Amino acid sequence: MAFLSACTSWRHVHNAGFTFITKFPFVRNVHKLSYHISPLSSRFSLADISVKENNHPNGPQLRLQTHFFHSSSPMHATKGFRFPKSSTPLTLPAVLSVASFANLLQIPTRRILRDLNRLGIKDVFPEYLITYEYSSLLAEEYGFDVQEAAAYSAPSPKSLNSKKDSGPLRPPVVTLMGHVDHGKTTLLDAFRKSTIASTEHGGITQKIGAFTVPFDKGSKFITFLDTPGHMAFEAMRKRGANIADIVVLVVAGDDGVKPQTVEAIKHIQSADVPVVVALTKSDRPGTPIHKIYEQLLNNGIQVEALGGETQIIPISAKTGKGIPELEAAILTLAEIMEIRASPRDPFQGWIVESSVTKGVGSSATVVVKRGTVKKGMYLVAGKSWCKVRSLVDVNKKSIKQVLPGQAAQVYGWKDLPIAGDLAYEVKSESEAKRILSDIYRQSNEQNFYELAESQNEQRVSALAAKKSGPAAIQEETSVSKSFNIIAKCEDTGSMEALSDYLKPLQFGKVKSRVLYTGVGPVTETDIERAETSDAIIISFGVSVPKATFRLAEKHNVKLLFHNVIYHLMDDVRKLFALRLPPILVQRVTGEAIISAIFDIKAKRAVVHVAGCRVTNGTIEKSHKIRLVRNDKIIWSGEIDSLKHLKEEVTSIKKGRECGILLKNFDEIVTGDKLQTFVEEYKPPDF
């Protein structure tokens, strides 16, 4: 195609791989174009040409569209073949094989393979998967009118925050963020007058908790979100920042700004939400407050003490010091922001957490941003929909509705929604199903593109290996090992964090592969799937009955159960290391220093015997030995003779002296170090 405009530059990319650029003088009528196009026609076949006049502030401009092909090998010219004509537009899928594409267009497969080669796509074959980008290009060249189906666009997270709300003030949604073990959950205990922190596994938060707390004798409310501080839960912290109206950044006075604090600050800045800093453990003597001010400033947060706008409030959650001041700071900031929402608007909110409860089904913790959630409403979130069956507050009490700024547990989901999904109201079940159908189509198209790329690489690699013979195939299969994993978790947030940690595991060409993740207990199907695929099973936060452990043992399947993320990570790393090809290592068993050299007459020559003192371990005659000089290994071999005084011995322990005759080597000097060692295989350090 080509375009003629006032810039007088025409670029034509020939679809068979040929590119040229031609300068044209600016013309205002079609007749003058023939003078400039004629020279090209002698060298190329002109398939078609169309010229349109476009309106432009500087006067009408001509839009020139042409199809040129090499005259010696035109794209449209195939001897004895005519392209089919069709009056109806051709709808092409996101991905299809060359053979299917040829069958759909009723065009010989070999023709399409040749044209793909001319487009620069090499190593193609009938099973090769091509995307819509290339199939539509070829179809248009073959004379077909191609159309692409319009996809439904679901509301995005940005649409939730971009809308300017009206109506009464609503409770602010406040997220607590900070480094692990800096006191976030203990601070929430102080707000709720509860003891959450003492009941959490490993003393750390591993999912987002959401609940509404009354203040000023019930006249005001704040909805709090607690986020995990452990490094494995970055996605949860990012989600917490995106959902929040205000963030309370918790920094421990005795620890200062740490890695997860810095990461939390980046999420806060990315989400562009106001922040209040809570300085915990500030009642401890020697707290370097000014140093923490500087650390925060270096990461983009300027507190009021340094001339900025960010409040920093020293508190002690255990004694209650500073808690009223922190509450007042949050409520004052919320009043300044005028956070409003009408309960009469259509509902929109966030999925904070979701889980499956035995006997109850799928549920999700929802924070309402606008509108009201009531029983009987139809909701969509991500790839799931729900007819609200029941609503439960943080105290496990059934409620009739959830107002803006409040959080509650919503029951009735057909499938488990994913934490972080935008939830919104629809009018009916049929509308919910239609929306999900379009969402799945969009998702499948993206999956198809990824699948096409992956499968094409595998098929091309397999063909190359086949051409190279059995040795290449053996080599290819020997290095393509994977560490297969099936993971079951108590909720979607934990599942997300665990998947993010497991997927990047790699050492050399061995890498982890998460075959399946799900919410709920380990089932017999999971064990059978693990046995078939040589996978381990991880149960995180979901207790495993003894019968399930026995079943896994019967099927020779390794099953891990943990409530604490860092304990789980340690065990996964150990198991991953066992799947790696072992490496040969040398373990030193004894070490001696040469303090003197003795010349001994042998049968045909004089040999040098090392007079040594054993400084570490035991020198074993049967072990291999190496000579180290200036921290470099000079020689490695065997011991010919090991003597204590004049007696031949098999070993010499630390602290004793001996004479060592090396086999076929006597270039020794005083001060050299002799080390005996054994060679053994072990998993590589990971």
Curated annotation (Swiss-Prot):
Gene3D superfamilies: P-loop containing nucleotide triphosphate hydrolases, Translation factors, Translation initiation factor IF- 2, domain 3. PROSITE patterns: G_TR_2 (PS51722), IF2 (PS01176). Residues 178-185 are annotated as: G1. It is found in: Mitochondrion. GTP binds at residues 178-185, 226-230, 280-283. One of the essential components for the initiation of protein synthesis. Protects formylmethionyl-tRNA from spontaneous hydrolysis and promotes its binding to the 30S ribosomal subunits. Also involved in the hydrolysis of GTP during the formation of the 70S ribosomal complex. This is Translation initiation factor IF-2, mitochondrial. The lineage of its organism: Eukaryota, Fungi, Dikarya, Ascomycota, Taphrinomycotina.
